[in-house]
Each structure stands twice: as C-alpha cells, then as structure tokens.
Amino acid sequence: MAQQRAYRYFDLVMVAFVTVLVCSNLIGPAKIAQVDWPLLGPLTFGAGVLFFPISYVFGDILTEVYGYGRSRRVIWAGFGALGFAAIMAWVIVKLPPAPFWHNQGAYEIAFGSTWRIALASLIAFVCGEFVNSFVLAKMKILTAGRWLWTRTIGSTIFGEGVDSLLFYPLAFYGTGIIPNDKLPLVMLSQFVFKVGVEVVFTPVTYKLVGWLKRAEHEDYYDRDTDFNPFTLKT
C-alpha cells in the first residue's frame, strides 16, 4: 500500500476554508447591506456575499496544490460543518426562551433561516464547489500548469455560476422575499460580485499557491484521478 504524504499546512488551509464557509453562511445572511459606489450608485446585497467568495479562493488553492481528491474531502468537511451549524441554529432558535429574556425576536432574525434557505445553501455550496474544483483540475492539465489566473478565475466563473443558479431559485422563488421578476438581476449582480472578488484576490492566490508548493514540495496534477464526488479517496 502506498504511503500517504504528510503535509505541513494542508490542515490549516482546510480550517481556513471551513471557517470562512460557516461564518459567511451563519453570520452574513441576516443583514442586508447597501453601499454607494462611485459611478455605479447604490448596491444592495446580503452581507454574507462579501466573504463567501473567499471560500472559493481557498478551494482553488487546495485543488491547485493538493489535487482534487484532497479538495473533495475538504468540501465534504465543509458540507458537514455547514449542515451541523444549520441544525444547531434551528434547535437553539426553537428552544423556549426564559421569561426574563426578551431577545427571542432578534435572535430569530439573526439565526432563524428557514429550512428552505438552509437546504438551498447546502445544495448550491456542494454543487458549486465540486464544479469549481473539477474545472480547475482539468484546466491545470490542459494548460500544463501555466497561467494560474485562467484556472482560478475560469473555475470560479463555472462554480459560482452553478452556486447562484441553484441557490436563488431554490431559496427564494415564489416566496415573495425577492420578487420572481427580480431574481435574475439579483443572481447576476451577486455572480459578478463573487467573480470580482476572485479577480481581486488573484495576486494573493499566486503568492499563497507559490509558497505552499515550495513548502509542501507538492504540485499535484489530477491525471489519473477518480472525479466521483461521492467518495473520500485521495
């Protein structure tokens, strides 16, 4: 049996990925923000979208350095953490408050996401992340490891596209929270914003990828990888 490589920083990148994922989904959605941009005017968005794209940056780093197989395990770890956070929030919100505690309403607003939104978030996350990782791994082979920016941005376009196409209709269609005729505009604006974050972080991604490849003595190519998402093999 082949001995598994021991990596110095893989677990830290995994923790960073899961932390950004859970925090952006648990803390961010409760607040709707509006920022006035020069020339563009006011932009309204769910606050979680500000940080969620960073999970794609870490996803790109994981696949680029360690390969699809290890990235797949991290995606499922993130899925489990996000699912547990959703269940925990639901249970705590449903607990009857003490008679002297008068903050139940505010707590429900902050952490009382409906099951429809929570389920939509889980489905969109896992599908989008696997598409992102798959596209990056395949593009790395096609480009022979050159032009990292084409892989990070290209894979994010596909991954975030799938995420947005799944999340917004599954979470909001027919609910009245977002009018049905406004959903395409909301999806497009959020998609453009998320891809823009990836573009802005490209220099940081280059630095981290280069440093990790040197530190780990690893630059994985998924030439013989089983891309089945429903396995934990590395």
Where are the predicted features?
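N-terminal membrane topogenic signal
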Residues: 1-16
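Alpha-helical transmembrane segments of multi-pass membrane proteins
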Residues: 18-34
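Alpha-helical transmembrane segments and their lipid-water interface positions
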Residues: 28, 32, 85-93, 128, ...
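Structural signature of hydrophobic alpha-helical transmembrane segments
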Residues: 42-52
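Central hydrophobic cores of alpha-helical transmembrane segments in multi-pass inner-membrane proteins
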Residues: 50-61
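Membrane-interface interhelical connector segments
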Residues: 91-116
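Internal alpha-helical transmembrane segments of multi-pass membrane proteins
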Residues: 142-161
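Short, highly charged, low-complexity non-transmembrane loops/tails of multi-pass membrane proteins
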Residues: 209-234
